[in-house]
């Protein structure tokens, strides 16, 4: 993903909320997606399931991004150690939290990630020197942080400017809820204002903006606005809508 983004190629993925069989990654790659994003905050995969998916993702050369239940050192360390290289960290409200996330995600000299022995997170590679291995792993990690509150947007530039933060996004429903516009006629307008602020700030700091979309038209709109990381819908939403559309025709 880092290489594709460096080449300015749009990366289109989807959320995995329901599937637990790692073979879902093979199917998504065969469908043409560029990556998958597995949710641990609002769904229930075990750390063993995440490890299995991470192993297959790397064998397939198909990036797997994981949202942990919390953006703390413990969860970031566990995910990296089982072989996850892409993090999508929720509830990053302050520059201090962003700094803690960035420090936990990479080894010295740019961070203070907890040192682990040989394992999936290091490709079991005992041949590289310690310095070369740490530099390689640091270069693979990609960190996206989620801004989901008014406080986060008050610190927008500081969070985005944090060294080690690669991309930013917003949590639309949590943000709308906090701003008091969830389910109101103004929700779309207010969220779009925040999306445009986020994109402008990301571009100003040389970082990426990521965006969740529900339709192809939404994706096209934000790509034209400069977004290069798109999360299109989810396994749950795509399955349900496809079955519902078919059943409506079969049982008119």
Predicted regions: what is each one?
Residues 24-26, 30, 66, 71-85, ...:
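Catalytic cores of alpha/beta
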Residues 1-64, 70-71, 103, 143, ...:
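Conserved N-terminal beta1-alpha1 strand-loop-helix module at the mouth
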Residues 1-15, 127-139, 196-204:
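N-terminal amphipathic alpha-helix/helix-capping segment at the start of soluble metabolic enzymes
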Residues 13, 36-37, 88, 169, ...:
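Conserved beta-strand positions in the central sheet of alpha/beta enzyme cores
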Residues 74, 86-163, 174-177:
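Conserved anion-binding
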Residues 86-100, 168-177, 227-246:
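Glycine-rich phosphate-binding active-site loops on the catalytic face of alpha/beta enzymes
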Residues 72, 113-129, 141, 147-154, ...:
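C-terminal alpha-helical cap/extension of soluble enzyme domains
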Residues 47-81, 103-110, 135-138, 187-210, ...:
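Alpha-helix-loop-beta-strand connector modules within alpha/beta enzyme cores
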